[in-house]
């Protein structure tokens, strides 16, 4: 209803101003600004909905001010371009309509009415309401009843007798199992669900709506609210360090805790969370690549579900034979939005809906088959009688190609339990949420029936039953939950450990690189993650007087305040204010100590603007002084006009990437010398090794041959035509995820470049 009212007010404002208000620059600007805000808010809502499927929620608050640079980002480029073009067109059309009768005399009453209607349209819009609620949740002091409902369980289970297998199905919500809505989509896993304890009303709450948040909620009984963006958790050294979580209780009770997934464990700090709470044995893409049958069989995120679940079965078999008490947690990935992935071993590779193939539904049908196969192996084993199997979704599906069909249904998370010791077949319609999962499992294993804000759905009362407004209540508890991190409120001294790549201050430790906003009563960490913008772009959003400490590779800050370090990949520390003074310090010791040194200086807005503009220069446009192209730092020498076909800098250099261009092309500002030596330090990838690699300057072509290790080769060129462009053509680019950013599409690698130098020859 609010959507219709909001749009009606918007339309009325446009029509009244366009036809009755007349000519007045001030009223035109004010009305266009407010109407433009309405458009921006609704496009923000649409864009957020596209990424999350749940509007402007806590999970995407961070992306309102930072770039989304991870998780299959290439699949979102076209929608993003469409939004920008659409926004430009709408603003242009809006301005044209409002000025239709600009030659008529100004009418104060109609102008005021149009502006008030425009303000009303903004106030009534769902986007404004959602953002307002999020802003309130950031500034609340907490709720006095939090302590009454947050309960810490006993740290041990008195007499544990059962092993635990806990399967997180990526985005595998219970809605997919509605056979009337989606016939024969999940027959194998659906049949197993119907054989166990099936909890049919597991709702999703704020702070539980993405993978690491769902894991924290289900194991600790609290939403993931943090003093930083949740997916940036990889930068912290400990995770809710004071809380007792399911893994802690299991470890204290004699369990060996294992976790197996196909993606990189570092993503979103899953490794930090699990190590902080009782898990000593972790297996992700890096750990599995040396043990899986086919290390090259991977999708954008890591290993496919069939590979991961095969390894989980091997681990279950090994641990069961040993006779030790254990828990085995695993997380699938093939159903990840926006499209999902199809494992090659499943029979269900294609699912049609509305008369056409649907990739997301196909991925769900395939993944559930793989999960069911894993469970059936356990059920057929002699160890099933000593095992509890839990299957849950980590969160509801985000905006995938099945999302519009899911939204027509009553959506709930998946959570069911199969007990080998005591088979139970029942569907329990009790109202509950993800935070109740850990408490329910703990209850089944013989422990307490509460865990944080979670309650056992077998013997307790969920917060979802106690509070009809549980979503609002959860947001009200947000400050209380953030305080559980015990995060410091001041930063005076700090230490950098180069061996561990860590910074320590006031008892807290963070991985590098890191940006910190420091005020009198708060220290706000801004880590760099797959989902966040680079730190320099985040720093560009700081106010002129905001105090900052920025620890990063020297070359990243050198272009601003330390040009002599433009080619250094060492750690540097910059601190100050963007509108005031800044200092850059080179970290030159293994253990390096310093103090914050913020000066209360006069703010120079011209300096501030210059700093912000420089911080926002994209990597490929950065230029540095050097007599060669150094590939392990961003940018290029000043003599280079532009370049293409080259991937991002890595610690050793850069790969060519045929996804960005079939050729490596470096165009110089001026013609290359008439005679010169081209000194190339590089290596080849895969089948490009020992193959002739054409290198062209103008009409002249030389051949470069590289191995898999870095070597230096000198090629001799004549350049009678004054050509200004160097072209290198890798013969056989290889599609691979090696060294790739998690969630990005595979790169097509050819040669790895360390340095290219042009040396003029005499004569």
Curated annotation (Swiss-Prot):
- MF GO annotations: phosphatidylglycerol-membrane-oligosaccharide glycerophosphotransferase activity
- What is the gene called? mdoB
Q: In which pathway does it act?
A: Glycan metabolism; osmoregulated periplasmic glucan (OPG) biosynthesis
Q: Which family does it belong to?
A: Belongs to the OpgB family.
Q: What is this protein called?
A: Phosphoglycerol transferase I
Q: What class of enzyme is it?
A: transferase
Gene3D superfamilies according to UniProt: Alkaline Phosphatase, subunit A
Chief location of this protein within or outside the cell:
membrane
Q: Which residues form a coiled coil?
A: none
Q: Which Pfam families does the record associate with it?
A: DUF7024 (PF22895), Sulfatase (PF00884)
Instruction: Please give the HAMAP family that the UniProt record associates with this protein.
Output: MdoB_OpgB
Tell me, in a sentence or two, what this protein's role is: Transfers a phosphoglycerol residue from phosphatidylglycerol to the membrane-bound nascent glucan backbones.
List where in the cell it is found: Cell inner membrane
Sorted alphabetically, the keyword list is: Cell inner membrane, Cell membrane, Membrane, Transferase, Transmembrane, Transmembrane helix
Cellular component terms, GO, for this chain's entry?
A: plasma membrane
- The answer to keyword Membrane applying to this record is yes
Q: Which SUPFAM superfamilies match?
A: Alkaline phosphatase-like
Per the UniProt entry, the Enzyme Commission number(s) are 2.7.8.20
Q: How does it sit in the membrane?
A: Multi-pass membrane protein
For this protein, the parts annotated as crossing the membrane are 4-19, 26-48, 76-98, 105-127
BP-aspect Gene Ontology terms? glucan biosynthetic process
Catalysed reactions, as listed in the record = a phosphatidylglycerol + a membrane-derived-oligosaccharide D-glucose = a 1,2-diacyl-sn-glycerol + a membrane-derived-oligosaccharide 6-(glycerophospho)-D-glucose
Protein's UniProt keywords contain Membrane: yes
């Amino acid at each position: 209803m609010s959507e219709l009212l909001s749009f009606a007010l918007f339309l009325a404002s446009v029509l009244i101003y366009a036809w009755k208000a007349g000519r007045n620059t001030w009223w035109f600007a004010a009305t266009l600004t407010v109407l433009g805000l309405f458009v921006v808010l609704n496009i923000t809502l649409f864009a957020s909905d596209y990424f999350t499927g749940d509007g402007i929620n806590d999970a995407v608050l961070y992306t309102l001010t930072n770039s989304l640079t991870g998780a299959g980002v290439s699949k979102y480029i076209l929608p993003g371009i469409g939004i920008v073009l659409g926004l430009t067109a709408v603003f242009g059309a809006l301005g044209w309509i409002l000025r239709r009768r600009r030659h008529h005399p100004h009418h104060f009453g109609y102008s005021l009415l149009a502006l008030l209607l425009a303000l009303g349209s903004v106030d009534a819009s769902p986007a404004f309401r959602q953002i307002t609620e999020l802003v309130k949740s950031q500034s609340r002091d907490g709720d006095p009843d939090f302590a009454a409902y947050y309960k810490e369980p006993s740290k041990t289970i008195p007499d544990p007798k059962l092993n635990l297998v806990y399967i997180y199905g990526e985005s595998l919500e219970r809605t997919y199992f509605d056979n009337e809505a989606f016939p024969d989509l999940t027959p194998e896993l659906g049949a197993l669900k119907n054989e166990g304890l099936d909890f049919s009303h597991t709702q999703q709450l704020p702070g539980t709506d993405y993978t690491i948040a769902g894991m924290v909620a289900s194991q600790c009984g609290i939403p993931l609210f943090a003093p930083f963006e949740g997916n940036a958790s990889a930068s912290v050294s400990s995770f809710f360090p004071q809380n007792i979580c399911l893994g802690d209780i299991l470890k204290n009770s004699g369990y060996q805790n294992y976790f197996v997934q196909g993606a990189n464990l570092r993503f979103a700090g899953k490794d930090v969370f699990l190590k902080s709470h009782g898990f000593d044995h972790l297996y992700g893409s890096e750990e599995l690549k040396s043990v899986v049958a086919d290390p090259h069989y991977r999708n954008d995120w890591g290993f496919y579900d069939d590979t991961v679940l095969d390894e989980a079965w091997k681990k279950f078999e090994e641990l069961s034979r040993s006779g030790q008490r254990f828990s085995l947690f695993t997380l699938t990935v093939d159903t990840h939005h926006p499209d999902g992935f199809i494992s090659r071993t499943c029979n269900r590779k294609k699912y049609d809906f509305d008369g056409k193939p649907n990739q997301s539904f196909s991925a769900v049908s395939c993944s559930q088959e793989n999960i069911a196969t894993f469970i059936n192996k356990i059920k057929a084993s002699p160890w099933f009688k000593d095992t509890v199997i839990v299957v849950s979704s980590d969160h509801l599906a985000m905006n995938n190609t099945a999302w519009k069909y899911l939204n027509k249904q009553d959506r709930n998370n998946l959570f069911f339990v199969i007990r080998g010791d005591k088979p139970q077949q029942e569907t329990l319609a009790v109202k509950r949420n993800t935070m109740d999962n850990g408490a329910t499992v703990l209850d089944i294993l013989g422990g307490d029936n509460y865990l944080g804000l979670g309650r056992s759905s077998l013997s307790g009362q969920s917060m979802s039953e106690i509070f009809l407004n549980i979503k609002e209540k959860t947001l009200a508890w947000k400050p209380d939950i953030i305080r559980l991190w015990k995060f410091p409120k001041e930063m005076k001294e700090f230490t950098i450990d180069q061996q561990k790549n860590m910074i320590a201050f006031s008892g807290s430790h963070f991985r590098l690189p890191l940006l910190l906003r420091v005020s009198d009563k708060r220290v706000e960490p801004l880590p760099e993650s797959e989902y966040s913008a680079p730190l320099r772009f985040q720093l560009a959003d700081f106010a002129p007087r905001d105090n900052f400490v920025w620890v990063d590779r020297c070359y990243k800050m050198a272009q601003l305040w330390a040009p002599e370090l433009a080619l250094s990949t060492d750690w540097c520390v910059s601190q100050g204010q963007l509108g005031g003074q800044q200092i850059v310090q080179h970290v030159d010791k293994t253990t390096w100590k310093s103090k914050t040194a913020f000066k209360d200086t006069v703010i120079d807005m011209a300096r501030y603007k210059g700093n912000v503009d420089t911080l926002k220069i994209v990597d490929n446009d950065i230029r540095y002084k050097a007599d060669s192209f150094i590939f392990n730092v961003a940018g290029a020498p000043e003599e280079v006009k532009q370049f293409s076909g080259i991937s991002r800098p890595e610690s050793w250099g850069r790969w060519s990437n045929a996804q960005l261009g079939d050729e490596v092309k470096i165009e110089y500002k001026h013609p290359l010398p008439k005679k010169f030596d081209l000194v190339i330090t590089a290596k080849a990838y895969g089948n490009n090794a020992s193959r002739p690699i054409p290198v062209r300057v103008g009409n002249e072509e030389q051949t470069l041959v590289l191995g898999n290790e870095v070597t230096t080769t000198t090629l001799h060129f004549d350049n009678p035509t004054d050509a200004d462009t160097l072209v290198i053509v890798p013969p056989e680019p290889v599609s691979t995820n090696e060294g790739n950013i998690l969630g990005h599409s595979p790169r097509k690698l050819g040669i790895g470049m360390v340095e290219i130098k042009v040396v003029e020859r005499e004569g």
